[in-house]
Regions:
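Charged, amphipathic alpha-helical coiled-coil/dimerization segments
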Residues: 71-131
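Short, locally clustered residues in the helix-turn-helix/winged-helix DNA-binding domain
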Residues: 12, 40-47, 107, 134
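C-terminal regulatory/oligomerization modules of transcriptional regulators
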Residues: 1, 123-141
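Short amphipathic alpha-helical elements of helix-turn-helix/winged-helix folds
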Residues: 17, 41-45, 58, 132, ...
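A short acidic, leucine-rich amphipathic alpha-helix
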Residues: 54-56
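Short alpha-helical elements of helix-turn-helix
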Residues: 5-9, 32-40, 67
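N-terminal leader segment of winged-helix/HTH proteins
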Residues: 1-29, 76
């Protein structure tokens, strides 16, 4: 195998490991990782809300079904949506108090899972790893 093949295969195995560990945290709460990601985006937006298209653009994993994803979260009363007053073609999204409470339950176990997933890397190695992954992402964005 080439070095590039080995590198990509290792990256994919590491991503799968991280995804499985994070799924184990959110699934007992009735969430997918994509739904969790939406809730985090909306929590960060605060009271201003976020247009649907911006939520889609800020997702870690891009999804063509952002409307269905938001529908499910709205059915669970974790988010609310409202037509934008300035541009009636857009909908703004907010996290609800119920959504915030759910994230608060998940935050500590999620952070612990991140630490456990990265336990083989020292802090300076983590920083270098983050820079390398950022460069890889930027080259293809």
């Amino acid at each position: 195998m080439s070095c590039a093949t080995d590198t990509v295969a290792t990256l994919m195995r590491a991503a799968d490991l991280a995804r499985r560990r994070m799924n184990a945290v959110v699934e007992p709460h009735g969430l997918t990782l994509q739904q969790y990601n939406v809730l985090r985006i909306l929590r960060g937006a605060g009271a201003d809300g976020v247009p649907t298209l911006e939520v889609a653009n800020r997702m870690i994993e891009q999804t063509p079904g952002i409307t269905r994803l938001l529908d499910r979260l709205e059915q669970k009363e974790l988010i609310k949506r409202q037509r934008c007053i300035k541009d009636r073609r857009q909908h703004l999204c907010w996290i609800t108090p119920k959504g915030l409470a759910l994230l608060q339950k998940i935050d500590a176990p999620f952070a612990q899972t991140h630490e456990e997933t990265l336990k083989g890397l020292r802090r300076k190695d983590r920083a270098a790893f983050t820079r390398l992954l950022g460069a890889l992402h930027a080259a293809h964005a």
